């Protein structure tokens, strides 16, 4: 997804509610990952859903959705990350 080139007051005012919503989705394991580029121009979200329509329904609930352009939804065949693996055992 692409974010606006500049953030106006309306966009900035929505950020706290958007972050709260993303945090809730992370806690509920609906969102697996959420990232924004360092220049704040692009974002990536990995969402668990039954199909594209279910994922789009989640994205459309984002408080910042109407500011986003170029939202693409791709179904993943494989998603592997260190965060999704079992924790290492520590022998104290």
Give residue spans per PLM region.
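Generic structural motif
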Residues: 4-6, 50, 76-81
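A short linear boundary/processing microfeature
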Residues: 28, 61-65
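Glycine-rich beta-strand-turn "strand-cap" elements at beta-sheet edges
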Residues: 37-38, 64-92
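Short, surface-exposed linear patches
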Residues: 18-23, 54-57, 67-71
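Residue-level marker of positions within ordered structural domains that often coincide
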Residues: 23, 60, 78
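Short S/T/G/P-rich N-terminal loop/turn motif that feeds into the first structured element of a domain
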Residues: 1-33, 39-40, 83-92
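Short, well-ordered beta-strand segments in beta-rich or mixed alpha/beta enzyme
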Residues: 1-2, 35-62
């Amino acid at each position: 997804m692409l974010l606006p080139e500049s953030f106006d007051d309306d966009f900035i005012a929505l950020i706290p509610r958007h972050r709260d919503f993303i945090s809730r989705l992370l806690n509920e394991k609906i969102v697996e990952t959420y990232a924004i580029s360092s220049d704040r121009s692009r974002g990536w979200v990995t969402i668990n859903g039954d199909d594209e329509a279910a994922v789009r329904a989640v994205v459309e609930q984002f408080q910042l959705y109407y500011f986003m352009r170029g939202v693409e939804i791709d179904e993943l065949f494989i998603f592997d990350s260190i965060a999704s693996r079992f924790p290492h055992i520590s022998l104290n």
